[in-house]
């Protein structure tokens, strides 16, 4: 799926956030644990999927552009998480970030 200019700018911020948090997005790295545009069984693509130490999906990260409240992607991200058997979701527009454990409640703001 094509990414808008604003969403691309948001993704730059999200990439920085992930790297500062210890996640590896380098496609040439053997330690890479983040996949971008990760295919789901239904044929759709999750913006990002964070992988566990065994390479299995752990968390779906849905990216939106700066101008959009990331919470609008809540149901879309839940669909991806369910398809990929992920318990955790991050919703972000590069400025606002929410963490959601779909087994225990609603998204919470993170910084």
Language-model region placement:
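Accessory nucleic-acid engagement/destabilization modules that flank
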Residues: 1-111
